[in-house]
Amino acid sequence: MLKYPDYISKLISFLKKLPGIGFKSAEKIAFELLEWDPSQIEAMAQALQEFSTSHATCSNCFCLKISQTSPCNFCSESRDSSSLCIVATPKDVFALEKSKIFKGHYFVLGNLLSPITGKHLSLEKLAILKQRIEACSPKEMIIALDATLEGDATALFLKQEFSYLPIKISRLALGMPVGLSFDFVDANTLARAFSGRNCF
């Protein structure tokens, strides 16, 4: 069987690691790149290198830092410290910021609880979250997680974990399609779900 040159096979294997990219899509992208001007490929390689060395997360909230200020922009005193929004990924922070509905602080959990795979929350992040809530005493903790099995399980865990605190715990209202992640929810729908959040 005729095989691709190693440099193409290697690129395909890396592209396949991206979410939503299977072999056929990776193959198509690889051959599309063959048509690019070498300067374009070099520019993309440089962008990937800069991405690898430049991105950083805040040690307080785990949001992506958009500047070198400390605390980060999302932890600054200019934001409303009375509300803390719990999200799964740094990308979710930007989705909520686009909706312009939330002006408080964030905390990025990272991986969610998975009853199917047995994946657990990061104990280190949970400890940091507890310290932050106990130190800052926000009035409301808003759980803004995807309407999925993992999101539901994680939301329930957080509710139970922080039930001893005198803090309002709410979750996004109906309007967030079940099983859909923030990636596929437009800013207006997200804003309505946020403004209509309920205690649970």
Swiss-Prot record:
Renumbered zinc finger spans (C4-type): 58-75
Pfam family, one: RecR_HhH
Keyword line: DNA damage, DNA recombination, DNA repair, Metal-binding, Zinc, Zinc-finger
Alphabetized GO MF terms: DNA binding; zinc ion binding
Keyword DNA damage in annotation: yes
Gene Ontology BP, a term: recombinational repair
Domain Toprim: 82-177
Matches recorded under PANTHER family: RECOMBINATION PROTEIN RECR
HAMAP family, sorted: RecR
Name of the protein described by the UniProt record: Recombination protein RecR
Gene responsible for this protein: recR
